[in-house]
């Protein structure tokens, strides 16, 4: 019973992570927002199928953190996975 519960929780967390990581992070007007800046030129190819953004961490302002805004039908940390489950595909 305990193993079954743990498996369900892990599956839930994985699905939640995938959904959250594939959500667009642009503002309503298409702006990056105050804590998201364009990536430096050396990170131009960081995202496989999307746009790179430099996320300014509020708790560690000097630490660089890069994220991707994925193109349509792509998901993942660096937009490298084609989302075949997308109903618009």
Curated annotation (Swiss-Prot):
The GO terms this record gives for MF are: toxin activity
Signal peptide extent:
1-30
Q: In which tissues is it expressed?
A: Expressed by the venom gland.
Can the keyword Signal be found in this entry's annotation? yes
Localization per record: Secreted
Keywords from the named record? Disulfide bond, EGF-like domain, Neurotoxin, Secreted, Signal, Toxin
Primary location class: secreted
Write out the GO cellular component annotations: extracellular region
Please report any disulfide bonds recorded for this protein chain, giving both cysteine positions.
Answer: 39-52, 47-68, 70-79
Q: Where is the EGF-like domain?
A: 43-80
Function according to Swiss-Prot or TrEMBL: Ant peptide with probable defensive activity which acts as a potent agonist of the mammalian epidermal growth factor receptor (EGFR). Mimics, both structurally and functionally, vertebrate epidermal growth factor (EGF) peptide hormones. In vivo, intraplantar injection in mice causes long-lasting (several days) hypersensitivity of the injected paw to both mechanical and thermal stimuli. Its long-lasting effect is unusual for venom toxins whose effects are usually immediate.
The similarity comment for this entry is: Belongs to the EGF domain peptide family.
Name listed for the protein in its UniProt record = OMEGA-ectatommitoxin(02)-Rm1a
Q: Which organism is it from?
A: Rhytidoponera metallica
């Amino acid at each position: 019973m305990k193993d079954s519960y743990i498996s369900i929780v892990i599956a839930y967390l994985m699905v939640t992570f995938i959904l959250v990581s594939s959500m667009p992070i642009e503002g309503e007007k298409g702006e990056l927002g105050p804590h998201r800046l364009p990536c430096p030129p050396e990170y131009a190819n960081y995202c496989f199928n999307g746009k790179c953004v430099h996320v300014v961490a509020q708790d560690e302002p000097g630490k660089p953190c890069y994220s991707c805004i994925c193109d349509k039908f792509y998901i993942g940390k660096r937009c490298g996975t084609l989302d075949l489950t997308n109903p618009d595909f």
